[in-house]
Amino acid sequence: MALRKATKEDVDHLSRRPLGLFTQTRIGAMPRVRRVRVGEEGGRKVCLFSVTAPASKAGSNTSATFDHFVAAAVELPERIEGRLAILRRGPLHSPRKPQFAEAKDGVDARVLDDYHVYASDPTLAAAVLDGALADWLVKDGHGAYYEIVHDLAVAYKGRNFMLTPRKSLLGRARALADRVPATAGS
């Protein structure tokens, strides 16, 4: 699989996706999508990218702090009507929380021990987070945040330096996409 530098249209299309990662920050600024690479693997579109989001301003408007994320996205085999965020619990780096409610009903308790789950529809969370996906999240899915948005599975993590292995995130996004139950889209 060879990834190529994204065109302006590719970046614009990705930036318009309703990912929690792209929501307006608490200081009213919009995150910026950067370093986008796109390609195809096994007949599905894949994408690697970085996001820089202003987190706070210093006393004068001349300085700000930023949250930095690296992410990978893989096209789902089947479209899902709705959005789901699976955000790992932990004190170190807070993810971009989506604008819908936390879902707990019908979600595997093992998943809830390790992750906060948010869904546009609570029944979607229960339908998606069972079986193989729940097992993978608990056993091998640690270390990243996940979102499923319509036809896209995204894995991302905060980064403090430029050397975060982006290809490993692509593997996580691919594993997530491969484990979403086919019946969840209906």
Provide a role label for each language-model segment.
Residues 2-186:
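Charged, low-complexity intrinsically disordered regions
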